[in-house]
Amino acid sequence: MDTGEFKQLIDEKGHEFYRAMPWREDTRPYYVLVSELMLQQTQVGRVIPKFEAFIARFPDEETLAGAPLSDVLRLWSGLGYNRRAKFLHETAKMIITEYNGVFPSKKDGLLKLPGVGVNTAGAIMNYAYNQPALFIETNIRTVYFHHFFENGGKVADTDILPLLEQTIDKEHPREFYWAIMDYGTWLKKQGVGQIQQSRHYKKQSALKGSVREVRGQIIRSLTNADKTENELRSELLADERFSVALSGLLKDGLIMNTKGLFHLTK
């Protein structure tokens, strides 16, 4: 397929497979940031109700920055990867204190925000500001694998970037990326454009039996009440993963130990 045909196809598929999402209805930068951090490692169906609850409680950067981290973690609980909540909280504080409440719109400024890497910065530039910025993630890889790398073999993002540069709709980058994402999601459901082709592919580790599972259990337990280590161990039927999970949460600043009582960071 040549790039001209591909661009027309993406426009068609964008209309055919469009998915309504609250952060698409309102593309203010704060909403896009919240959605992008939530969508890291978490499926859209699980994110939408959490996003709506989060925005209802923390409607803007100022409200989020002024809230204790413990409130943010309580609302985040269930999404997993709780460090994302801490990054979001720190970002809100940074926007208020260092950016005078003005959300950065350029890549350099966005990359200074906690938890924002190249892909998240690119997503914010496209979705919030409608500025064409190249970024690649799983659904995007899926589409380009299917149409330009059908012969198999490992493909690096550096192989995809020139094609993305040639095919991105520079006048309507927001709609282009929405279309790519929605089409890629549909392709994956059909079992085509497999991400295993990517040189960057890493299979996500299973939650069951992992330290990550215990971290989530500790956070959920502490959303209800402060507890001693013995109380946590007894409640969670602690095994060898417990100590690693507990020390990791302390190191990440998600929980604290005050006079023998563990609690969510205020």
Where are the predicted features?
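Accessory DNA-binding and partner-docking regions appended to nucleic-acid-acting proteins
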Residues: 210-215, 264-266
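C-terminal non-catalytic scaffold/interaction domains in large multidomain proteins
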Residues: 222, 262-263
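Short amphipathic alpha-helical interaction segments
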Residues: 236-250
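Hydrophobic residues on short alpha-helical segments
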Residues: 215-222
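Residues in the recognition helix of alpha-helical DNA-binding motifs
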Residues: 124, 245-248, 264-265
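Catalytic cores of DNA base-excision repair glycosylases
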Residues: 2-213, 226-240
